[in-house]
Design a protein with these regions (language model features):
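Active-site-proximal loop->helix
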Residues: 82-94, 113-115, 119, 123, ...
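A glycine-rich helix N-cap at a beta->alpha junction
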Residues: 90-105
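Conserved phosphate-binding/catalytic loop of the ribokinase/pfkB sugar-kinase fold
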Residues: 77, 103, 113-155
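Conserved beta-alpha-beta core of the PfkB/ribokinase-like small-molecule kinase fold
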Residues: 150-227, 249-251
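Short gly/ser/thr-rich secondary-structure transition/capping motifs
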Residues: 3-6, 131-136, 176-182
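Glycine-rich phosphate/adenosyl-contacting loop at the front of the ribokinase-like
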Residues: 1-75, 82-89, 93, 270-274, ...
Length: 345
């Protein structure tokens, strides 16, 4: 039987300065077509709006954390093209350092997205210069990695750079946060250097080798994830947290401590979802912010949900990423629902 115990700890906005974060970024020039609904295979639909903006999972997280008051260093590869020029202009506007931004020969990354009226989306990405980063680029950023209090990585950049940066972080005792998206099976060395894994409900099926998709309810998802935690721990020996985002159903978080797992569920904020593209990056940013503030897992899930909701309630991604004032306004309107600890009896 699944039961829940409420936690009513308040969520508060702290003021900067906060500790430093190192983000393994990536950059794609994103082109998004807004359509009434997503097309079927072989079908052509007319889009009613075209949106072009800089994007990328790592770039989104770097920008969001910077806006929230975190001191961010980021490793990004971009091409020697107009898109690369646009990236440098964006970083300058956001106040992000470009010490570890590398202009490489060839095109920048490009992405194409279709966004339905209900907020659903499908995305394709050409990595371009993102795949040209190497372990040497991560080594050149060693000082920034070792000075960070959290290192974030994702799979839209070169895997060898992520692996090298996580190894540096682990050797220094810096917690690592991995969003293995787009999903691919991570190498053993990367699994052995990852403290926290964040995936969505689709990626969780691959990550945990589940026999079927999660059933779409927090209770069913929690049972499936809980049953797979022993296998996850064996495959990811350094991992102490696993977070699974459930869209409109919030997020699950599991934590390994004192040789046992505990699990929490944080309900999603009720919003009118306009565009869910980038909501997961918003969640990762809010979660990372909470970790940097020293918050426990239940509060980190609440922060993640709050930032994700801010993005999903707006069109676009970069412009929809919150700052501290934006989050404070949301909290003033309606405090987030308390996370609940789940037990299986």
């Amino acid at each position: 039987m699944l039961s829940a115990r409420p936690r009513l700890d308040p969520i508060v906005v702290t003021t900067p300065p906060l500790p430093r974060a190192f983000v393994l970024g990536n950059f794609v020039q994103a082109c998004c077509w807004h359509v009434a609904r997503l097309p079927q295979a072989g079908e052509t639909l007319e889009a009613h709006h075209l949106q072009i903006e800089p994007g990328g999972k790592g770039l989104n997280v770097a920008v969001c954390l910077q806006r929230l008051g975190v001191a961010v260093d980021t490793l990004i590869g971009c091409g020697d093209d107009a898109a690369g020029d646009a990236l440098l202009a964006l970083l300058a506007r956001e106040g992000l350092a470009t010490t570890h931004v590398h202009r490489l020969t060839g095109p920048s990354g490009w992405g194409a997205g279709l966004i339905g009226a209900d907020g659903s989306n499908c995305i394709a990405v050409h990595p371009g210069a993102n795949r040209l980063l190497t372990a040497a680029h991560a080594e050149a950023a060693r000082g920034a990695i070792e000075a960070a209090r959290l290192v974030y990585g994702q799979f839209e950049t070169a895997l060898v750079a992520v692996e090298a940066a996580f190894a540096i972080a682990q050797a220094r005792g810096v917690p690592t946060l991995l969003n293995p998206s787009p999903w691919q099976a991570p190498p053993e060395a990367l699994r052995a250097a990852t403290h926290t894994v964040i995936v969505n409900e689709v990626e969780a099926v691959d990550l945990l080798a589940l026999p079927q998709p999660l059933d779409g309810t927090p209770q069913g998802a929690a049972r499936a994830v809980a049953a797979a935690l022993a296998g996850f721990h064996a495959h990811w020996p350094a991992a102490r947290r696993l977070v699974v985002t459930l869209g409109e159903h919030g997020a699950l978080g599991a934590e390994f401590d004192d040789e046992r797992w505990s699990m929490w569920h944080a309900p999603a904020r009720a919003i009118n979802a306009v565009d869910t593209l980038g909501a997961g990056d918003g969640f990762s940013s809010g979660y990372a912010l909470a970790v940097l503030q020293g918050d426990a897992l239940p509060m980190a899930l609440a922060w993640g949900n709050l930032c994700g909701a801010h993005v999903a309630a707006r069109t676009g991604v970069i412009d929809a990423l919150p700052d501290a004032q934006g989050l404070a306004a949301m909290i003033e309107q309606a405090p987030p629902a308390a996370a609940r600890q789940l037990t299986f009896e």
